[in-house]
Amino acid sequence: MGLEKSLILFPLLVLVVGWVQPSLGKETSAMKFERHDVDSDSSSSSPTYCNQMMKRREMTKGSCKPVNTFVHESLQDIHAVCSQKNVKCKNGQTNCYKSRSALRITDCRLTGSSKYPNCEYKTSQQQKHIIVACEGNPSVPVHFDASA
C-alpha cells in the first residue's frame, strides 16, 4: 500500500517541481527595470560610466543596446513616481507616470562608430523628470519610458 502511494505521488511531485522551479529564477518586469534603469548608489561622474554599467548590467550581450537611462535616486523615490501624475506612454498605453520633480539621471547612447562586441557609449548626466510605466498592486515601475 505504501509503495503504491509512493509510485503515484512521486511522478506528481516531479511534475509540480518541474512546473514551479523555472518560475523561481525568472526575472520579473520590475526586476528587469531595476537592473536596467536604477543605480541608486552612484552619480556617474566618470566618462566611462555607461561603458562599464551597460556591460555590468548585461545590456551588451549579443548586441549593443542603443540607448539606456540610469536613475540615481533611492528605489523608494523611484517607486513613488507610480503614484504621481498619470501621462500617456510613448506607445499609447495609459499606465505611465511622470515624476513631480527633476531626478538625477545618466543617459547612455551608443556612439556612431561603435560595433558589437565593442559597445562604446556616450555618458550624459542630467536632471530631468522621468516617465515610467507601472504595473501591479502595489504599483511598481516596470519600464523606463522617457525623460522630460
Curated annotation (Swiss-Prot):
Entry's Gene Ontology cellular component terms: extracellular region
Signal peptide from the UniProt entry: 1-25
Localization, UniProt: Secreted
Major subcellular site: secreted
Active site (record annotation): 143
Database matches in PROSITE patterns: RNASE_PANCREATIC
UniProt-listed CDD domains: RNase_A_canonical
UniProt GO molecular function: lyase activity; nucleic acid binding; ribonuclease A activity
GO biological process, one term: defense response to Gram-positive bacterium
Classification via PANTHER family: RIBONUCLEASE, RIBONUCLEASE PANCREATIC
Function: Endonuclease that catalyzes the cleavage of RNA on the 3' side of pyrimidine nucleotides. Acts on single-stranded and double-stranded RNA.
Superkingdom, natural source: Eukaryota
Disulfide bonds: 50-108, 64-119, 82-134, 89-96
Family: Belongs to the pancreatic ribonuclease family.
UniProt-listed Enzyme Commission number(s): 4.6.1.18
InterPro entries on file: RNaseA, RNaseA-like_dom_sf, RNaseA_AS, RNaseA_domain
Gene: RNASE1
Keywords: Disulfide bond, Endonuclease, Hydrolase, Lyase, Nuclease, Secreted, Signal
Catalysis: reaction(s): an [RNA] containing cytidine + H2O = an [RNA]-3'-cytidine-3'-phosphate + a 5'-hydroxy-ribonucleotide-3'-[RNA]; an [RNA] containing uridine + H2O = an [RNA]-3'-uridine-3'-phosphate + a 5'-hydroxy-ribonucleotide-3'-[RNA]
Subunit structure: Monomer. Interacts with and forms tight 1:1 complexes with RNH1. Dimerization of two such complexes may occur. Interaction with RNH1 inhibits this protein.
Binding site for substrate: 32, 35, 65-69, 90, 109
Record-given protein name: Ribonuclease pancreatic
Tissue and organ distribution: Pancreas.
